[in-house]
Amino acid sequence: MDISNQLTLEQEFELVLYKQKIDPLNLEQAQNLLVETLKTMMLKDNIIKYVVKNSHFR
């Protein structure tokens, strides 16, 4: 079984916190939060790609 696509307990907890943060928002606020979250994920991807590309362990 491939567990790489499963969330850790900590990540599951983080999802619950996000849901609690999103529930009271109106549509526009939720959309803005989504855009900011996606931007953060993209920046994280860029950092990971940079580290892998510049890693001395290739």
UniProtKB/Swiss-Prot annotation:
Question: Has the keyword Zinc-finger been applied to this entry?
Answer: no
**Assigned keywords, A-Z:** Chloroplast, Plastid
InterPro entries documented for this protein: NblA, NblA_sf
Query: What name goes with this protein?
Result: Uncharacterized protein ycf18
Q: Which GO terms describe its cellular component?
A: chloroplast
Q: Tell me where on the tree of life, at the top rank, the source sits.
A: Eukaryota
**Coiled-coil ranges (or none):** none
In which organism is this protein found? Porphyra purpurea
User: Where in the cell does this protein reside?
Assistant: Plastid, Chloroplast
Pfam (any one): NblA
The family assignment reads: Belongs to the ycf18/nblA family.
Keyword match Metal-binding: no
